Amino acid sequence: MFCAAGGPASPGGKSAARAASGFFAPHNPRGATQTAPPPCRRQNFYNPHLAQTGTQPKAPGPAQRHTYYSECDEFRFIAPRSLDEDAPAEQRTGVHDGRLRRAPKVYCGGDERDVLRVGPEGFWPRRLRLWGGADHAPEGFDPTVTVFHVYDILEHVEHAYSMRAAQLHERFMDAITPAGTVITLLGLTPEGHRVAVHVYGTRQYFYMNKAEVDRHLQCRAPRDLCERLAAALRESPGASFRGISADHFEAEVVERADVYYYETRPTLYYRVFVRSGRALAYLCDNFCPAIRKYEGGVDATTRFILDNPGFVTFGWYRLKPGRGNAPAQPRPPTAFGTSSDVEFNCTADNLAVEGAMCDLPAYKLMCFDIECKAGGEDELAFPVAERPEDLVIQISCLLYDLSTTALEHILLFSLGSCDLPESHLSDLASRGLPAPVVLEFDSEFEMLLAFMTFVKQYGPEFVTGYNIINFDWPFVLTKLTEIYKVPLDGYGRMNGRGVFRVWDIGQSHFQKRSKIKVNGMVNIDMYGIITDKVKLSSYKLNAVAEAVLKDKKKDLSYRDIPAYYASGPAQRGVIGEYCVQDSLLVGQLFFKFLPHLELSAVARLAGINITRTIYDGQQIRVFTCLLRLAGQKGFILPDTQGRFRGLDKEAPKRPAVPRGEGERPGDGNGDEDKDDDEDGDEDGDEREEVARETGGRHVGYQGARVLDPTSGFHVDPVVVFDFASLYPSIIQAHNLCFSTLSLRPEAVAHLEADRDYLEIEVGGRRLFFVKAHVRESLLSILLRDWLAMRKQIRSRIPQSPPEEAVLLDKQQAAIKVVCNSVYGFTGVQHGLLPCLHVAATVTTIGREMLLATRAYVHARWAEFDQLLADFPEAAGMRAPGPYSMRIIYGDTDSIFVLCRGLTGEALVAMGDKMASHISRALFLPPIKLECEKTFTKLLLIAKKKYIGVICGGKMLIKGVDLVRKNNCAFINRTSRALVDLLFYDDTVSGAAAALAERPAEEWLARPLPEGLQAFGAVLVDAHRRITDPERDIQDFVLTAELSRHPRAYTNKRLAHLTVYYKLMARRAQVPSIKDRIPYVIVAQTREVEETVARLAALRELDAAAPGDEPAPPAALPSPAKRPRETPSHADPPGGASKPRKLLVSELAEDPGYAIARGVPLNTDYYFSHLLGAACVTFKALFGNNAKITESLLKRFIPETWHPPDDVAARLRAAGFGPAGAGATAEETRRMLHRAFDTLA
């Protein structure tokens, strides 16, 4: 490993250089010398000698063995004019864009160097041996590699006639004659040397039924089939396979059985070996479509792992002599294909797995973040990578040692000079963190090229950040490829022809989802990890840091970045501090969750690499495991065309996905939570959540059902029984599988019902599954082995050292994840190996188990004497009141049992025994119930929605958002206070329970229970605070995210859009896309009505305006005049029409404006909003009738008339004063009754 780190101080006598210093020096003629400019602070960036025309930067020539930039003498120069600090303000907008003829430069610590020059010292750490074809290894460097750790596996095709083949041993030449697939293992030695091991001899293959092939193609020998295959390829479109011959194939006859159906018997198949993955893909899709292909979509890496027992995708290997004592062959540096320190050629028999080694070598983790800025006329616009003027201005890179978690380096790439604040430097030093190295650049191209050069030279094995897959990487890669035409295939571990790409794989709610593949670099986005592991109302980094790390970052609004950036090096340093601290927080999140450990454990178990584990969903994990086991048992898996491999050709409006890396239909990709209900109605009604389990897949059967809940407030104990691993245990207990299923009664006619097979009706169809003694289920074997492995791993955790315990915990969690994927794997109609009959049977049996449990509990323990017979200890655990036990809810794998006449402590003590009793009585092993928890109070609202307090006092909330981000702080606090009162005040709890026991309609005609007075007092106080003129408006501020341009919204009547247009009309600073817009709802006044009318005209102007950003008018447009209508009999005197009641979205106002102008809040809206939030939670007390709930809650509120301001003024002028009202609606009714009696 070679490393030159740090930023050296300026040599004595040499002037300190900073970005773009000396740009205004006179241009030197060719061949003339130029003296060094005097020391100066870098300010201006514009080069007067930029050529406005020219050629593109020279890419590496064809003779070179690499495609990364190792030399460059001309490039496109783009830099913001805001860096021209001596120029007049009107000249500091936009960007300089031209061509510059010189080598790319970097400035650091007063020194200046070429970005691409490799010397004994450098500004950033390096781990490289070769650069641009030159070997920079120390003299005598010859590392001995015996053991190495593998973290990534690549595959490519080599040809015997290639230049590199001349240096290969004969046995490797045989493997690539005329062509062959080579597997490359990338890893690290214990000493820290980067290694690449090229494994020859791996062959992909597929199966076809021999009888069908012989009948269709008249083949008499395997060689005949090879000739037919070669002919089909030569006739394919294009020139790719023109020279292919039968020598590219080998065919042999084997005996195998189709994995589908019990009655399928072993028969003869052709196994065809193909030397090229592309040829295999074409044949499986196009060769004799009438003949079914088997396992044709399995890539070479999977074949390498599965066909060599014990091989792993992540772990330690040892090089050893192979057959005939043949050793691995070291490659000379001139033949290196990667940026490794040492490379070897070998075959699979030269490799052995070192299973006893479980620690990690010194892999490097890069945590990075970019800051961008729009460079057009509107610098507050959201930057778009395809626009040349929108620039990356800073990139922070934090480099960690993954084995020790130590932060080793902090780098900050800056477009323009940058001085980090002394306070920030002191804070880093006080925490024992390294001092940042600030790298300054004159242009965006130089900065991005330096960043990619650093990535290539340092070669971090793992990369993380926050939303880097959806934003940071796509922005950087788009800039490089679209604006600067830089090829990226050499910037991973491969020196050329490697993959370095991001794909858009669809939309999840309003969040774009992408995947990235970089050869030799594992990208783990912490945004995806956090959304999967933690349930939060907001997933912005600051909110996550507060919730998870108890830390808070120094935030910098995006709208402040342009002003800071243009204000000089010191203010750019503030942006740099912001950029670095984002990366620091993400690094802390990474080492808190350690996602690489769980992902690597899944990769090992499933036999796929980590990148596929991250991005290719759940299906591939189960498929590879099933493929391995099926091969051992003599089964083959049919190829579902185009589903296992990725797309080979570009689809319309979607980037092409290379083979083996595409999104597979049916893969479970958890939806990220959207940030807002954007296109919905203004009141933010709750949407029906799309089930995560389907993830957008087409599921061709009815899913699991639940026992409808008995809604209400239960103050008697409720014990919750859970089925342990419900679906996996059903598959095991009933031996469900593709291979044990039959749809034909005659197939099982020779077997005895119940003893030899299960007969079950699912969806009106009879299905048969043979028992394990007839044929053991492949799925059952997988689950049994996995669960046994998980049990063994968990047993080792308590006795293990802390570091090993963490690793073991991640391994057992990974096994659980894969086990839970098996049921979903079978139930996806367009999945890799669908079997809807199995999935539907699982859910049907699960439903029957819920019903059987309910019937058993109701019959077995209906009387207390019956309970005593099974559990004598219950005699001393009675509670006051009558005894009863009944099921009040069943939710897929949970059963809620309401137990009256028993204490909560009794159920905690007896719960496990009760669960075991039911399991023994009703279910086949390994199905079993477990006592999960016991509620002392439970508010059961609806399916999957409840709030409860378990024994011990902890509150559990499921499916109910007490604190919603689209509610104001006041409503969130009040809602939480009401819930706490309901559960922790026994008087209120008792009254609420009595309330819930009676039909809701009864309470309309009778007073509410006295015990609810404290509950009502909270509502009364909330109403008082809402109507209090001295209230704090900040408590009533709502927010919504501007997720896209206002013109892109289909529903324009949204409150935050109204505020956006009001700000634009007032020529105030408008929010940028992705900003959250704060607003309040104000009362309808004449001024508000006039503003709304003007806004309608402004919306029309903006909708017709070209361009991406709205242009505010010089003055607020006047509303269009309408012809005066003839007054009707309903019009008020004078013929004036009654003003229209404005929509809630039209009443939205900027909080600052409302405070400054004293605009009154709409108290009716806020109280209605509070009641609406309360009704969602507490309607279970009133039979889930929201209308009755709201009506009864209003009883607590004093009735007060709030006339409009103009009406109140007229009343006061006429001598009227405010009349008193009753404290409640009931008292007001009585007062009015007496008044009418008196008047009568």
UniProtKB/Swiss-Prot annotation:
Residues 1-26 have a biased composition (Low complexity). It comes from the Viruses. GO terms for biological process: DNA-templated DNA replication; viral DNA genome replication. Residues 1-65, 646-695, 1103-1139 are annotated as: Disordered. Keywords: DNA replication, DNA-binding, DNA-directed DNA polymerase, Endonuclease, Host nucleus, Hydrolase, Multifunctional enzyme, Nuclease, Nucleotidyltransferase, Transferase, Viral DNA replication. GO terms for cellular component: host cell nucleus. It catalyses: DNA(n) + a 2'-deoxyribonucleoside 5'-triphosphate = DNA(n+1) + diphosphate; Endonucleolytic cleavage to 5'-phosphomonoester. One of its GO terms (molecular function) is RNA-DNA hybrid ribonuclease activity. Residues 44-56 have a biased composition (Polar residues). The keyword Hydrolase applies. Residues 669-688 have a biased composition (Acidic residues). It is found in: Host nucleus. InterPro entries: DNA-dir_DNA_pol_B, DNA-dir_DNA_pol_B_CS, DNA-dir_DNA_pol_B_exonuc, DNA-dir_DNA_pol_B_multi_dom, DNA/RNA_pol_sf, DNA_pol_B_thumb, DNA_pol_palm_dom_sf, DNA_pol_type-B. Its EC number is 2.7.7.7, 3.1.26.4. Gene3D superfamilies: DNA polymerase family B, C-terminal domain, DNA Polymerase, chain B, domain 1, Helix hairpin bin, Palm domain of DNA polymerase, Ribonuclease H-like superfamily/Ribonuclease H. Replicates viral genomic DNA. The replication complex is composed of six viral proteins: the DNA polymerase, processivity factor, primase, primase-associated factor, helicase, and ssDNA-binding protein. Additionally, the polymerase contains an intrinsic ribonuclease H (RNase H) activity that specifically degrades RNA/DNA heteroduplexes or duplex DNA substrates in the 5' to 3' direction. Therefore, it can catalyze the excision of the RNA primers that initiate the synthesis of Okazaki fragments at a replication fork during viral DNA replication. Belongs to the DNA polymerase type-B family. Forms a complex with the ssDNA-binding protein UL29, the DNA polymerase processivity factor, and the alkaline exonuclease. Interacts with the putative helicase-primase complex subunit UL8; this interaction may coordinate leading and lagging strand DNA synthesis at the replication fork. This is DNA polymerase catalytic subunit. It comes from Human herpesvirus 2 (strain 186).
